[in-house]
Amino acid sequence: MLELLTEKFSHALEKLTNARKITEKNINQTLREIRLALLEADVDYQVAKDFIKRIREKVVGKEVPKNLSPAEFVIKTVYEELVDILGGEKADLKKGTVLFVGLQGTGKTTTIGKIANLLKKGGHKVAVSSTDLRRPAAMLQLQRLAERVGVPYYEFEEGLGAVEIARRAVKRAKEESVDYLLLDTAGRLHVDEELMKELQEIKEVTNPSEILYVADAMQGQTALETAKTFHERLGLTGVVITKMDGDARGGLALSVKEVLGVPIKFIGVGEKIEDIEPFYPDRIAQRILGLGDIQSLVEKAQEVITEDKAQVMATKVMTGEFDLEDLREMLRMIQQMGPLDKLLSMIPGVAPQLKHLKVDEKQFKKIEAIINSMTPEERRNPKIINMSRKKRIARGSGTTVSDVNKLLKRYEEMKKMMRKLQKAGGMPAIPKMPKMPRFPSEASSFNLFLFLST
């Protein structure tokens, strides 16, 4: 996600690393590259132009704070401006009826299922319904998603029009004291008057708390132009951007708030029901600048591991008692947190510096099979594993002695790295990488990426 933009921003800002002061020459070169990066990312032309203008006004001729280098001052300014054009603060979803509008093929119906799942996990009472009479398959799809998530799907007798279905769905949601009614609407391959009139009538009878436009990140400015039409007729309150995980550019995300004046509420980051995230402008800005996203990483960890369990794991790491049973537990935890490449992108400095690493997620199964073939005593004390034991473990796991040796060697290297981390109080210095945070779980995750890389 946003890899291309991150790479180009890093390259542009790198030129200021050794600068003793900000001059017209060096800042012009940096800003020129940033401007080109934005335009290549399909950011709206006026948005890119204004962005560069604001940065120039804030850094050229200004005194650099004593606690910052010239490069840090520029990066700080760029970060603040990125947060601003991305929307400033996270925009919460207002309770009530939420209308989802947009064209066909953007993932609107699937997005409703994902958001229903997210809201339910947050402890909210959620219901869904559909007014998309033109695509019966969409109604069936939403019904199945609702069953999977475990929220009610409001279905009504045949013969009702879209507007009447919407009215009855709202009435039922109020009777059942639902926090959020997520209402799907008909889409089109392109905007037409019939669609807009129907949506306006649905808006009138439902009095929605939110009207969210669902846009495909890959469509860039095309999606933005269509969103303008919807906004003019309906008064959008927010945007959901789907397929962000496949968007290396990010032009749509960087243009929405400035062009439409409404915030991005959610982003879709994968195909699974869990692959939806609230949109945090500051976190996206950090990712664009290669500063990682520790907040999201911690939140993902908290979903799969309790604080007590994390403390036990951290204590084992610090005391050198981390064994192969703990490694197996960590592997399972990391798998539950999501794809390795996504987690890697959240660690500050790691993604751009270690992008040459290839992480094969099939390694998980192989490593776990090897560890499972060991006896409890061998897992707790790998030093007793001699050649005879290695042959038995290899046979039992369907691997080779070489695979077993590789696992044991990397395990010992990982333990050594962890001990160094604890003594140093954080990630040891790696050229051109920022110092890593002092959280054992994050350091362990980083080492696990190295452990699994091929």
From Swiss-Prot:
Keywords recorded for this protein, A-Z:
Cytoplasm, GTP-binding, Hydrolase, Nucleotide-binding, Ribonucleoprotein, RNA-binding, Signal recognition particle
- Please tell me whether the keyword Hydrolase is annotated for this protein: yes
Per the UniProt entry, the Enzyme Commission number(s) are 3.6.5.4
Citing just one GO molecular function, the answer is: GTPase activity
Reactions catalysed according to its record = GTP + H2O = GDP + phosphate + H(+)
Identify the SUPFAM superfamilies for this entry. P-loop containing nucleoside triphosphate hydrolases, Signal peptide-binding domain
Q: Where in the cell is it found?
A: Cytoplasm
Q: Which family does it belong to?
A: Belongs to the GTP-binding SRP family. SRP54 subfamily.
**Complex formation:** Part of the signal recognition particle protein translocation system, which is composed of SRP and FtsY.
The function of this protein is: Involved in targeting and insertion of nascent membrane proteins into the cytoplasmic membrane. Binds to the hydrophobic signal sequence of the ribosome-nascent chain (RNC) as it emerges from the ribosomes. The SRP-RNC complex is then targeted to the cytoplasmic membrane where it interacts with the SRP receptor FtsY.
Its domain comment says:
Composed of three domains: the N-terminal N domain, which is responsible for interactions with the ribosome, the central G domain, which binds GTP, and the C-terminal M domain, which binds the RNA and the signal sequence of the RNC.
Q: PANTHER family of this UniProt entry?
A: SIGNAL RECOGNITION PARTICLE 54K PROTEIN SRP54, SIGNAL RECOGNITION PARTICLE SUBUNIT SRP54
This protein is called Signal recognition particle protein
